[in-house]
Amino acid sequence: MNPMIFIILLTTIMLGTFIVTTSSHWFMTWLGFEMNMMAIVPVLMKKYSPRSMEAATKYFLTQATASMILMLAIIINLMYSGQWTITNMENYTASMLITIALTMKLGLAPFHFWVPEVTQGVSLPSGLILLTWQKIAPLSLLYQTYSSVNMNILLLMSLLSIMIGGWGGLNQTQLRKIMAYSSIAHMGWMMAIMVYNPNLSLLNLLIYIFMTSSMFMLLIFSSSVSTLSLSLTWNKAPIITIMSLTTLLSLGGLPPLTGFLPKWMIIQELTKNNSVILPTLMAILALLNLFFYMRLTYSTALTMFPTMNNTKFMWQFQNTNILSMMLPLITISTLALPLTPMLILLN
């Protein structure tokens, strides 16, 4: 792909997201979603192959269906209220349709089937955009309409997403699919707190983007796409492997790493709102995620697949400039929780 065309596509993706996040008009919001979708499809097919074509087609069909449902909900709401304002949601049917459309765009269960398949079919940089930047626009719209969303349905979807995100990743060896199921589970945590404290949901999104970006950048740097290739990075880049392990454990929510912070705050907030059964179930189901991250850490750090002798000592020739660039992002992704008391004392 021509670099100039690629820059234009990335600019359009960012512009579409900014239109959605800053607009208070339903038509402009829908227009931003369409700009975003039409620009991301060529990016997913950047490395042309039958697998990437299939992934881009699945993504396009899912997002186009969600956009049609969203437009139907907008028209129904306009018919009953006579206004294009986002915050003015008076019709129950329109509210339900908008919830379904946005959860389809986010990849929440039971509309999650496209997320692992599309992520596995695209390259690592495209997967990074898909699992981080593409979550911002739907979540910002949910943030604006959370007061009119059906709370019980959203909580049921969130619990189902946490469960499927944990179970789906248990038997996976492909790192992109593991990251996709992790994304489904994290989206479930964000939706669970959205109806009680939407600001906390945005904080969770920010931490999730930091952790997922760190993990994908480490995978891109080490060219790892499976458990086998990740285990061989000990010979190529020991520092990268150590960073990957701590980032994986942070994604699993193991204290005292950064990933434990949003789970801790969400469970605390749900308990304050007299909800006991839901946070208990969420904490139990989160152990599924932690289990496959621990298994991945074990297979990477404590075991080593058979390898050729010519792969040894390659770490001496690695470029350390990229490591220094990634260091701040990885520090935030792993050590934000232990550093929090120090930041409070400094202030």
From Swiss-Prot:
Alphabetical UniProt keywords: Electron transport, Membrane, Mitochondrion, Mitochondrion inner membrane, NAD, Respiratory chain, Translocase, Transmembrane, Transmembrane helix, Transport, Ubiquinone
GO terms of molecular function: NADH dehydrogenase (ubiquinone) activity
Transport among keywords: yes
Subcellular location as annotated: Mitochondrion inner membrane
Transmembrane regions: 1-21, 25-45, 59-79, 96-116, 122-142, 149-169, 178-198, 201-221, 237-257, 274-294, 326-346
Organism superkingdom: Eukaryota
Main location: mitochondrion
Entry EC no(s): 7.1.1.2
Record flagged with keyword Translocase: yes
Subunit structure as annotated in this protein's UniProt entry: Core subunit of respiratory chain NADH dehydrogenase (Complex I) which is composed of 45 different subunits. Interacts with TMEM242.
Similarity field: Belongs to the complex I subunit 2 family.
Protein name: NADH-ubiquinone oxidoreductase chain 2
Protein source organism: Crocidura suaveolens gueldenstaedtii
